[in-house]
Each structure stands twice: as C-alpha cells, then as structure tokens.
Swiss-Prot record:
Location(s), subcellular: Membrane
Lineage of the organism: Eukaryota, Metazoa, Chordata, Craniata, Vertebrata
Protein name, as recorded: Schlafen family member 12-like
GO cellular component term, pick one: membrane
Native species: Pongo abelii
Keywords in alphabetical order: Membrane, Transmembrane, Transmembrane helix
UniProt family annotation: Belongs to the Schlafen family.
C-alpha cells in the first residue's frame, strides 16, 4: 500500500486484514530485538549506537510515536551523571525527536526512565533538557506536555504552528553563522529567516562590498574599517617578528586564536566551519592563528610538509561546507590561506596561520541545519535546500502530507459565504428525531441511505449521540479514502464526530465479524490529525479517538474497540470549546472532498449566526 509522505506507520492489507507493519531501517541491528516490538530505527546515516531514536508501532495511540530509549530524568540526577557525553547524547536524542514531531504533524515521545524511584512531580525533567526546549520553542507550554506513566515518560508534542509569519519549521540550529562584533554566532531561526528572505528578495549579493565614500581626515576618529585595513596589511606581510605587538584587535572582520602545535590541525578543523560561515555571511574577514592573548606574535613550529597538510585541511574543510544560492552565477567561496613566517633576530622560529575569507554571494552553512522530520517512514535530517525551502516558502510545509486531488475548494474565496449557503447548502442539513437539534448529521443523502440500508445503525448512532450536547457527525463511505489512503472495502462507513467538551472521535462501522480493523482505524485517525495541522492549518492541541463497531445482518451491534478506554492524554488535549469546534471544522474544510466541505461551511455559518443572534438578544 502506498502511503502519503510523512506518515510514520503504515498498514498492509493481507487477505482483507489490516496490520501495522514494522520494517527495520538503517541504524542498529534489529536481529536481537523482541519480534513483537521491532521498531523503525533512525535512517539518517549516523553511526549506529550514537543515535537511539526509533518509530514505535507497538502503541494504542493514533499518533506518531518516537521512542528515544532509556533516559535519565530529574535535575539532580542529570547533573550527577558521570558520563557527560551520555548526558549530551540523551539531550540530542530527545531534542531531535521533539523537532521531528513538531515538523511532522505532532505525536509523542516515549522514554524509558533510566534512574530508579524517579517522580516527575518531585524531580522535574532536567535543566539541560528544559533549556533545549526553550531554545527551540517560543513558548514551551503551547507545544509540549509532559506525563509520567509508570517507568515511562511521555512528551506530547503539538504540531509546529503556522499561525504567525515567523519560521514555518522547527529548528534546533540553523548552522548559519554571522559575525556579531567580535564573535561568530549562529543565527537563531528568526534571524536566519530574515537573512534568507533578504537574499531571496535581492537574488543574492555582490562578492565585493560597495566602496565607501571618501572621508575627510580625522586623526582622533577610529572605526571598524581602520581595524580591517590594519588586518589586511598584516595579512599581506612576508615576514613577522617574534613577540611583536599587533596594532589592531579582534573585530567584526578579525578573529585571533592561539593553539598548541600538537592540536593545531584538530582545532583548526573544528573551528573553520563556523568562522568561514560567519565571515562569508557577513562582510568577509581574517582568521589568524599563532597570536597570544596579549596580541603578541608567537607562532607555531612546523615543518614544510605540515604547512602543506594545513593548507589541504583548509581546502577540504571549506570545500565541504554546504552553500545555497539565490543568485544566477552560483559562485564558490573565495578565500586565501597562507603561513606567515615568524622570525626572531633574523632566524625563522615559527609560523602564523592566516586565512582571508571574502564575503559570499548567498548563504554558507557550517554544516547541515539541525532540523528533523519524519519522511518515508524514517526520521531524517533536512538538507540545507529542504530547510531553506520550508523556511522561506510556507506552501512547502504542506507538501510533507500531500492533499488528495479532491480537496480543492468548492467555492471561490471571493464568493460571499452567505450567498453560497443560500443556493447550495440548505439541502445538506439533517437532524435525527429524538436528538438535540444542536447535533447535525451530514451528508444528508448518505446518512439516509445508510440508515435505511443497515438495520441497527440509526439506533446505534442515537445511543452514541445521547451524551453529546452539541456537535457535528460527518459520515463518509471511507474517511481513509477521503484522506488519500487506501480504501478498505470491508468497512461499511466511517463517521467523524466533532463535539463540544470532547476530542474528535472517528467511528468505523463494519459487518465482517472476524476481521481486525484497528490498524485501519488507527492509521486513518493519525493521518487525519496530521493533515489537520499541516494542511488544514489547525494550530491547537488535538487528538483523535477511534471507536469500532460491528453490525450484524440482523441489526445487532457491538463495540469491538474504544481507544478512549485504552489511552490517556494530557488534560489540555481534552479541552474542546465552541471556538475549537469552529477551528476544527474550518481546518477540515481545507482537507475534505467537496461534498463534506459544503457541510462544514454549513457548520461555520450556523455557528456565526448563533453568535450574532446571541449578541443581538443580549442587547
């Protein structure tokens, strides 16, 4: 079965049955895993053992679930961890899992608590994890909810919100650097978005900066350009004197370092990506290695072969940096690397590593952006091209979950809603006798046909709606097909309930007694939730419950599965008000076929009319 992009789990149909399959991916070996709990391993090409993120299919939730393995939790416990690398790796795993879910329609993270006697209410999570969440999210409670369930810790993640004009994708690090006075700093998501949009608007920029107008001579005036000019003169010298004092200091265009010779190659390899990115994305600049904190020329001792190797390391490091072009020319990073000889009383005693980087026409990354999503049943890191496309083009975000071809709007956006309702919508309204008129059923023709053809269905619906004070029940021959998935022909029909004070419920009705429909129902509900956020534009927390009923030929009914009795969500996922009902119906109108879209326009119109009448009578 072919699935829409971005879904974590998929169902296969075998002899009419749906089963949630588990296929091992790249990463750690799956051979030793319990066959009942095989999971999708992270397929990002990183070394096995370092990454421990997997897609967990052994779950009752209609959610994308990422398992991050064993994690030490609690501020004191995490602070006392002896293995700092393990603490860092756990933080990265959890943070990347959060990022992937934010960018993939939401879900939750499952972590097995490493430390005994852990209590969320007493111990908290851990300051390093909290800081990672805060750095990624504008307001953590709007996106994350935390829950301990025995020895497991769950982090419920709402889909990244598209309600603002800010970044359209969650990011741990842009990997785009800039010079900030005397430092190379990574751009946060907002700064990166502004930088990229400026580049896109102008189609890149010239390699050479515009020449400054001539200035009158002012002896006492010192500017950034003075330090840059002195650094340029220093770079162009052929000989340097040992212990000579510099006449300039670090600035926007100058960075000074001093490393021990035995670690020189390693340290230069480590720092080059961020400093080259920063200089290239700003206005160019100079990196000098071999000067001490007192701005004295010290140099480092090296053979000629070592200097050659140093140039090769520089060339290879800069050549591997990811770049993205908005311009037509698509040039390369311009730089010049050399080793300046240091002399002590005429005797060569060492070298200073000198690197000049010209400003770049477009964007230079230090490495791939640290941003993740779930695609093709794998947790993947975005390439710089994908990330930029999502950042600057909000339409690209929706492409992760392709909308069915039938989801085009049935009416022009310029057509007044009331005019459209008067001519098209009134016949679709439908109410069942004995139930509150605040409960609406649709589409009218399909409802009547189903109730007349299948004895017991109407009575079952009346019983299920008995506790609903206000809501809409939207029937479909196949909600799975409406959402772009494969239809199960053994399903009689599906119905989605959107009601006040309860989460949405997806009902599945069938007449095949010995069949298993849990996988079908779960997959449909999960896809619906993801599309509500990524295509429909729904910005609040939401979960979709599932309920499966068997209808016998004699009209008898029985509930085969009720997700609400199997799972627990944070309280915030159960808050459904009149406003959230309206927002859900509006989001559904963006992803449904035309017939159901029309019904949702009815719901929106009735809600607006009700509010207007209420305000009128209050006056």
């Amino acid at each position: 079965m072919q699935l829409s992009e971005g879904l974590a789990a998929h169902g296969t149909r075998r002899a009419g049955k749906w089963k949630r399959t588990q296929v091992p991916l790249l990463g750690e070996e799956c051979a030793d895993m319990d066959l009942a709990r095989k999971e999708f391993l992270l397929g990002n090409g990183l070394a096995a053992g370092k990454m421990n993120i997997s897609i967990d299919l052994d779950t009752n939730y209609a959610e994308l679930v990422l398992n991050v393995g064993r994690v030490t939790l609690g501020e004191n416990n995490r602070r006392k961890m002896k293995d700092s690398q393990l603490r860092k790796q756990q933080n990265e795993n959890v943070s990347r899992a959060v990022c992937a879910l934010l960018n993939s329609g939401g879900g939750f993270i499952k972590a097995e608590v490493e430390n005994e006697d852990y209590s969320y209410k007493k111990d908290g999570i851990g300051l390093d994890l909290e800081n990672s969440f805060s750095n990624m999210l504008p307001f953590v409670p709007n996106f994350l909810d935390f829950m301990q369930n025995g020895n497991y810790f769950h982090i419920f993640v709402k889909s990244w919100s598209l309600e603002t004009s800010g970044p359209q994708i969650a990011t741990l690090s842009s990997s785009l650097y800039k010079r900030d006075v005397t430092s190379a700093k990574v751009m946060n998501a907002s700064a990166a978005l502004e930088f990229l949009k400026d580049m896109e608007k102008t189609g890149g920029r010239a390699y050479l900066r515009p020449e400054s107008p001539a200035k009158r001579a002012c002896v006492d005036v010192q500017e950034e350009s003075n330090m840059e000019a002195l650094a340029a003169d220093f770079f162009n010298r052929t000989e340097l004197n040992y212990k000579e004092k510099l006449t300039f200091t670090e600035s926007t265009h100058v960075e000074i370092k001093n490393f021990a010779t035995e670690k020189l190659l390693q340290r230069i390899t480590e720092i080059l990506p961020q400093y080259v990115s920063a200089f290239a994305n700003t206005d160019g600049g100079y990196l000098f290695v071999g000067l001490n904190e007192d701005k004295e020329i010290i140099g480092f001792k090296a053979e000629k072969s070592y200097l050659t190797k140093l140039e090769e390391v520089t060339k290879n490091s800069i050549g591997k940096l990811p770049v993205h072009h908005f311009c037509v020319e698509k040039g390369t990073i311009n730089y010049l690397c050399k080793s300046l000889g240091v002399y002590d009383k005429g005797r060569l005693c060492g070298y200073v590593y000198a690197l000049r980087v010209e400003r770049f026409c477009c964007a230079v990354f230090a490495k791939k952006p640290d941003s993740w999503h779930v695609k093709d049943n794998r947790v993947k890191q975005l390439t710089e091209k994908e990330w930029i496309q999502f950042m600057v083009d909000s339409e690209s975000v929706c492409e992760e979950l392709p909308s069915p071809a039938s989801t085009s709007s049935p009416v022009s956006q310029s057509c007044p809603l009331c005019e459209y309702i008067n001519f098209k919508i009134q016949p679709l309204r439908y109410h069942l006798p004995g139930l509150s008129e605040k409960i609406t059923f649709a589409p009218k023709t399909l409802c009547r046909n189903l109730f007349s053809q299948h004895e017991g269905l109407k009575q079952l619906i009346c019983e299920e709606m008995g506790s609903v004070s206000k809501g809409s029940l939207i029937f479909s021959r196949s909600w799975s097909l409406d959402l772009g998935l494969q239809e199960n022909h053994k399903v009689l029909c599906d119905a989605l309930l959107i009601s006040q004070d309860k989460p949405p419920v997806l009902y599945t009705f069938h007449m095949v007694q010995d069949e298993e429909f849990k996988g079908y129902s779960t997959q449909t509900a999960q896809t619906l939730k993801q599309k509500l956020a990524k295509i429909g534009g729904y910005t609040k927390k939401v979960c979709v419950m599932t309920k499966i009923f068997y209808l016998s030929p004699e009209g008898k009914t029985s509930c085969q599965y009720d997700l609400n009795s199997q799972v627990i969500y944070p309280e915030s996922y159960y808050w459904t008000t009149a406003q959230t009902m309206k927002d859900l119906e509006k989001a559904l109108s963006n992803i449904l076929p035309k017939e159901n879209q029309i019904f949702l326009f009815v719901c929106l119109f009735r809600f607006c009319l009700f509010v207007c009448l209420f305000v009128f009578f209050l006056r």
